Amino acid sequence: MRVTAQLIDATTGYHLWSERYDRPLKDIFALQDEIVQKIVATLKLQLTLWEQGDLVRKRTNNLEAYDYFLRGSEQFLRLTKETHAQARQMFERAVELDPQYAEAYQALGYTYLREWMFQWSPTLQNLERAFELEQQALVLDPSLPFAHVLLGWVHLWKDRQYEQAIAEAERAIALDSNNADSYMALAEILTYLGRSEEAIGWMEKAMRLNPRYPALYLRILGTAYYWTGRTEEAITVFERALARNPNWLAAHLFLAFVYSEVGREAEAKAEVAEVLRLSPAFSLEGVRQRLPLKDPADLERFLDGLREAGLK
């Protein structure tokens, strides 16, 4: 295996450090640690003992389990029911190969949560299973920020435990203040609570931390824009999300609602058709059961918009 690593100042284009490594494939994790330590030394960073430990933590020593985790992650991001099922199988295989692999449990739990959110499964057992798997991930590695994020989402979607959901997102931020996903999660929770102005601030911070943010970030930002009266900006952001990933069901759903609100009926119906393409059993009653908007008036408004757009 040959790796050429470069560290470049993004603001100036200046090469801070570059090195080539030739190693046997079995040494991939040791090589990863070595590269990280070289970057830290080059940047002259002063790390706490906790941060040093986090940098060299090995998620797994099983290369095959790691391969299944990466392959599962790729399928998970494709956002179709079929690729989602493939992702779950790969995460399950990663756990079988390494029962101590915390990140694999975390990812496996996410598959159960998303299956519920996208109405690919009608059963609440999915949320129970997601909760169990995220807890297992945190037993194995309490410092995983995104496992706390997912646990917070389960609290939100399963029991409407808004304060507990916020607490989990804040715990994730405390564990790693540079983890963009933690701020994204906090922003989403706040939009459901009717605190969208705050949510916009957190989403902007998340996007600064991760300039290559996924479509999910845009969907949450668009939602916050809508609830603060910035309707045209919301539409633009939802459209950008779908340009990045045309299979993002939630972006189609929210865009259908906003199009309906502004009288763009044909476009609203087209977005509902996309939702049904991705999840044929998707229904208004399913949205009512799932969407954790705290204000009942907001939920009814959302449902009315989708009904006008043709969702049944």
Label for each model-derived stretch:
Residues 1-262, 267-271, 278, 307:
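Acidic, proline/glycine-rich low-complexity intrinsically disordered segments
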Residues 281-312:
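Terminal, low-structured helical/coil segments at or just beyond the last alpha-helical repeat
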